[in-house]
């Protein structure tokens, strides 16, 4: 016997969260809970404004239609990425296809303060990895901050994310202020320039390795080994089903590229599932999941060690 519930939710964000030049005041999304006999599976559907093609209202419509079809015996996944991902997670939990083991190590997001980062990294076992958003301020400032961090913490490796913010000139301005002796400790810089060709040129000219992120979701993208390209950053909410995520990870690994499972600012429920996916598909790589503290609450499932209050399922708006 099958049954299902769909919940709508909204979490207040911290005041300083800006995505693509727009302030994100709340994180809006949906949960689906599927039951079959004694088994249960949950999934999160939370399109990311400015990044997802679909709105959460559109996702809600597709999700409700899919749930009704599933209750009638149809299991074909929807095409909409955020819905396909959430639904496939719920189905995977339902059938025990998503392992319970999780990688809760997260590359901490750094605001540029080395003292703050040293404290965050003190308890981190193994490789010291942190992430810095660049491209929000002047490229020269970004270069100076990155150089300062690498100089202050000799065993640090940084992941940088520019979200295609730079022109070739700005990329050169950034690199000018990063000591060439430190550049090998930049694990990768995600999508530095507005076009892939400009990003490739940046890697060749600076010796700083790059990673593809947005490019993975463009129709003309293919997985190929290229000079200067070290990694791909996979955001499952923006990608689609678990099977598609696994295919991308396997394609990257086949070329010797690092694959990083990364957050699209999901709630704690979605983040704990991403931690399980990372442990399953990319066990040797620290995932990019340090986004929970951008929110003012957790929901349904707790992230280990978080002190944020938890909203239980009974407090959510039930749609089905």
Curated annotation (Swiss-Prot):
<feature type="active site" description="Proton donor">
    <location>
        <position position="133"/>
    </location>
</feature>
<feature type="active site" description="Proton acceptor">
    <location>
        <position position="235"/>
    </location>
</feature>
<comment type="pathway">
    <text>Quinol/quinone metabolism; menaquinone biosynthesis.</text>
</comment>
<keyword id="KW-0474">Menaquinone biosynthesis</keyword>
<dbReference type="InterPro" id="IPR010196">
    <property type="entry name" value="OSB_synthase_MenC1"/>
</dbReference>
<dbReference type="InterPro" id="IPR013342">
    <property type="entry name" value="Mandelate_racemase_C"/>
</dbReference>
<feature type="binding site">
    <location>
        <position position="190"/>
    </location>
    <ligand>
        <name>Mg(2+)</name>
    </ligand>
</feature>
<keyword id="KW-0460">Magnesium</keyword>
<dbReference type="InterPro" id="IPR041338">
    <property type="entry name" value="OSBS_N"/>
</dbReference>
<dbReference type="GO" id="GO:0009234">
    <property type="term" value="P:menaquinone biosynthetic process"/>
</dbReference>
<comment type="function">
    <text>Converts 2-succinyl-6-hydroxy-2,4-cyclohexadiene-1-carboxylate (SHCHC) to 2-succinylbenzoate (OSB).</text>
</comment>
<dbReference type="GO" id="GO:0043748">
    <property type="term" value="F:O-succinylbenzoate synthase activity"/>
</dbReference>
<dbReference type="Pfam" id="PF13378">
    <property type="entry name" value="MR_MLE_C"/>
</dbReference>
<dbReference type="Pfam" id="PF21508">
    <property type="entry name" value="MenC_N"/>
</dbReference>
<dbReference type="InterPro" id="IPR029017">
    <property type="entry name" value="Enolase-like_N"/>
</dbReference>
<dbReference type="GO" id="GO:0000287">
    <property type="term" value="F:magnesium ion binding"/>
</dbReference>
<dbReference type="InterPro" id="IPR029065">
    <property type="entry name" value="Enolase_C-like"/>
</dbReference>
<comment type="pathway">
    <text>Quinol/quinone metabolism; 1,4-dihydroxy-2-naphthoate biosynthesis; 1,4-dihydroxy-2-naphthoate from chorismate: step 4/7.</text>
</comment>
<keyword id="KW-0456">Lyase</keyword>
<protein>
    <recommendedName>
        <fullName>o-succinylbenzoate synthase</fullName>
        <ecNumber>4.2.1.113</ecNumber>
    </recommendedName>
</protein>
<comment type="similarity">
    <text>Belongs to the mandelate racemase/muconate lactonizing enzyme family. MenC type 1 subfamily.</text>
</comment>
<keyword id="KW-0479">Metal-binding</keyword>
<dbReference type="InterPro" id="IPR036849">
    <property type="entry name" value="Enolase-like_C_sf"/>
</dbReference>
<feature type="binding site">
    <location>
        <position position="161"/>
    </location>
    <ligand>
        <name>Mg(2+)</name>
    </ligand>
</feature>
<feature type="binding site">
    <location>
        <position position="213"/>
    </location>
    <ligand>
        <name>Mg(2+)</name>
    </ligand>
</feature>
